[in-house]
Amino acid sequence: MLAVSAAGRLNVPAASLPEVRTESHVVSLTLHATVNSEGRDSFAYNGQNIAPVIRVFPGDTLKIDYKNDLPVHSTESCAISPCKNMTNLHFHGLEISPQSPQDDVIDMMAMPGDTLHYVVKVPPDHPPGLFWYHTHPHGESHRQALDGMSGAIVIEGMERYVPEVRNLHEQVLVVRGESIEHVPDAAALLRRVDAKPPSCGSESETTERVFTVNGELRPTIRINPGERQFWRIVNASADQYLDLQLDQQKLEIVALDGMPLAYHDPKHPRRIVDHALVPPAGRLEAIVTGPDASAHAALRTLCVDTGSAGDPNAAMVLADLRKGASTPRAPETTNRKLAPPEYKSLDLGSFESSQPDFVATFTEDKNGFYINGQKYEPDAAPMTHARVGTYQHWRILNSSAELHPMHIHQVHFLAYAEDGKRLENPVWLDTVNVPVGGTVDVVMDFTNPVIKGMSLFHCHLLNHEDKGMMAKILFE
């Protein structure tokens, strides 16, 4: 149930999230899984039910003591009933080890009363950008994500690729789809965010979600007319797409999924667009310019057609923009020597002319969700293997009537073709939207030696993942 009501305040400033920063090359914190005052599962940090932004440099170590303070018996429902209130952490997008005590979501699991001790070693050559952390207990991931158990991670150093951001005011915006399915005043909440009836797909359905930004419904973001700011936006929704648009202004995208655009194409470090699709788990980092103060302006999401079998993703306002002073952030790298920017521009010719090394086909029926006809089982053998030090050509095939965002742990991939047609601007991603009845071709980057071990790939509509649309991959 949504933690805000239709009678709540409007024009509340977007919350400034607490931050945890590096001290002597180590970031340390204690995070709790608990139940908040609204009865929802929640992260707690320093006595508050809020997830901090974790800021870390390449080469640093992240230490988290994660304590499961959830009750033994849950009052909520899960895809695999009954809920066990088990939990763990996934460091989404980070190119780190899948083995304990790092990004192990298969064997590291905390039951109520247990504590997990994470020691995550960020490689010194890790790309800078926006990443995030969220729980990943198979069968209960959707419920915990919908309750808001997620937070942002910033790997410092974006100014190496885009020098302008060094002196820009930065906004970290965690956007979550919140359920209003059982909220008595749901219609009033939809009016508060100017939600429009879905007009791009399932017109007969009413959306059961509204979006919050940093935990607030339709907050205010301060930006002066003509002022340039650096916005880092994560779609932390369990099952909702965003199609981001800024009134009166374009978005100058500089990074997607924590990867600077310059990483693949140094000559084109920015992409200027009217709006941008961000699937669940996707991230967008953009320079924005404050709109003219003479007219109302907002950050909004447009309607997204998710297919005849998909859920409605209605257009609505995410945040209002208001004139207001902001202070440039102090550069984080003042006393840190970072490596020069690295680039990885692949020659795609050999991949385009070859048959895929692996094809992942996403299907669904009334009994569940599948990859290559198989439902995920925790004790199953890996569906595929990859030799560390290589690239692989993968094709993702969506044989269903709804969109699926495909995510793989530990690595990024270069998405270069959709439905067999070469994309004009290939991009490095860790989560890609796969169109209804369509295909996406990608080059998987398995060259990093730290990824050795058992990992996962899955649909990031987490209800689909919970119900079987996930598989193991062994990096060897």
Describe the predicted segments one by one.
Residues 73, 80-161, 267-324, 404, ...:
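Extracellular/periplasmic metallocenter environments
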Residues 348, 357-415, 430-452:
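C-terminal substrate/ligand-recognition segments
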Residues 96-111, 182, 188-340, 421-423:
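Histidine- and aromatic-rich segments of cupredoxin/plastocyanin-like copper-binding domains
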Residues 247-261, 399-427, 462-465, 474-476:
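Active/binding-pocket-proximal capping segment
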Residues 2-117, 191, 195-231, 261-263, ...:
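N-terminal, post-signal-peptide metal-ligating segments of extracellular/periplasmic oxidoreductases
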Residues 56, 66-68, 234-237, 246, ...:
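Non-cytosolic beta-sheet module surface loops
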Residues 31, 64, 89, 135, ...:
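Divalent metal-coordination and catalytic microenvironments
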Residues 21, 156-172, 324-351:
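Low-complexity, Pro/Ser/Thr- and charge-rich linker/hinge segments at domain boundaries
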